[in-house]
């Protein structure tokens, strides 16, 4: 069973839908997200990275709040670097006058910190239910159904439709049916 949407699922979203989804998302630790890094502003080309949120940093600004998301892998590597730096400090003194070009790499690297506005969540089934509820899908009276015998899942807006087995969105995967409902509400 598919547990969350994928990067491919995000490709069909309009810019308005991406912005709306970002606004509805309250990032939490261990959420999976897609981070977008502008590679060519003139041609509107972006590199997309899938990452796990390790930390959410919220800062108050004049205009409201600014949220940054730190990649879980980056948190782990920062901790490892701090530990090794302490060991090096205790082992010997570093001579900063010696410069070696091999000490630095100027290659493109995946970012460790993302602005929330540059990210889109790869929603889980539970997060999609939350978004449908926030958006008032079916005036709060929506339902999901999974028929194992027919290998069908669906989402509907009106409980009266459920009696007649009417579904707004159907798919073999509940995740895909919910995603179609979420896209419809965005």
Where are these regions (language model features)?
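Glycine-rich anion-binding surface patch
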Residues: 1-186
């Amino acid at each position: 069973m598919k547990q969350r949407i994928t990067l491919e699922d995000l490709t069909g979203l309009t810019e308005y839908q991406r912005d709306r989804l970002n606004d509805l998302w309250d990032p939490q630790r261990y959420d999976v997200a897609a981070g977008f890094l502008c590679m060519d502003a003139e041609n509107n080309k972006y590199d997309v990275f899938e990452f796990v949120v390790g930390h959410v940093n919220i800062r108050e600004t004049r205009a409201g709040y600014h949220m940054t998301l730190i990649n879980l892998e980056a948190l782990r590597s920062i901790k490892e670097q701090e530990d090794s730096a302490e060991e090096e400090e205790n082992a010997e003194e570093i001579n900063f006058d010696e410069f070696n070009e091999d000490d630095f790499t100027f290659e493109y690297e995946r970012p460790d910190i993302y602005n929330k506005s540059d990210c889109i969540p790869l929603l889980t089934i539970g997060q999609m239910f939350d978004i449908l509820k926030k958006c008032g899908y079916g005036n709060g009276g929506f339902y999901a159904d999974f028929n194992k015998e027919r290998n069908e899942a669906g989402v509907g807006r009106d409980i009266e439709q459920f009696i007649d087995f009417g579904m707004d969105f159907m798919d073999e995967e509940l995740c895909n049916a919910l995603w179609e409902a979420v896209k419809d509400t965005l």
